[in-house]
Amino acid sequence: MAWIQIRLNSTNEKAEQMSDFLEEIGSVSVTFMDSQDTPIFEPLPGETRLWGNTDVIALFDAETDMAEIVRLLKEAKHLDSNTAYKIGTNRRLKNWEREWMDNFHPMQFGKRLWICPSWRDVPDENAVNVMLDPGLAFGTGTHPTTALCLEWLDGLDLKDKSVIDFGCGSGILAIAALKLGAKSAVGIDIDPQAILASRNNAEQNGVTDRLQLFLSDEKPSDLKADVVVANILAGPLKELYPIISQLVKPNGDLGLSGILETQAQSVCDTYTQTFALEPVAAREEWCRITGKLKTL
């Protein structure tokens, strides 16, 4: 199917409103990208996952009068002399879902753990295999931040431990922890679609009896765990420090990712108040910060 793309530079505060308006005037799809063309995959507990400088990309049918779209954007004050935009034409829209499924293969993380798409055979039946169908939620293991978290979990002794996956997306981290030996896990997310995807993946892996799922505003106030992992972004990690740090039991383990290497020091400066931090692990400009809750 032929399509026309309009790409508009926006800000954290305006991107969601612009997205809603684009859908109202006929866009068939709206996505967010940061300034480095990295997809913004999922909302975080308590807020929307957006960088400060965000590009909003909307697709329209090839027959759309883009001059009229631009006029409507200007009329609604979503487009002004300070808003940069580009319009692209004569490209073909791929069957992205089919292509993504064809390219998603089993992946190994650490020594024991494999993440396997539910439509493929497992490569090692004796390994710890997590069967995954992400649906519309973020988290397949292909992104460096997810990979760093999975490798960290694989390296922990999770036997009889409790785990919290803060911003659970597809549930991949919580489910992996359970299959690696954790006694119980809790997944938290703001998006009902993430809760649904996590529940479906838990059923696929036979761990529904050990996994609790909560929307962020419904989680128990006294919730704590031996291991807490949060694969979100540097800004929210710092803002949510009081909440995240309170989730960790005494001498418990914390794993943070979704952080660019250039942002690692500022996140470390925040969490070193109450955590004994380990050396930062990095991959493809992203990094993971881990540590133990300090004891008094």
Swiss-Prot record:
The keyword Repeat does not apply. Its main location: cytoplasm. GO terms for molecular function: protein-lysine N-methyltransferase activity. It is found in: Cytoplasm. Its EC number is 2.1.1.-. GO terms for cellular component: cytosol. It comes from the Bacteria. CDD domains: AdoMet_MTases. GO terms for biological process: methylation. InterPro entries: Ribosomal_L11_MeTrfase_PrmA, Ribosomal_PrmA_MeTrfase, SAM-dependent_MTases_sf. The keyword DNA repair does not apply. It holds the Pfam family PrmA. Methylates ribosomal protein L11. This is Ribosomal protein L11 methyltransferase. The gene is prmA.
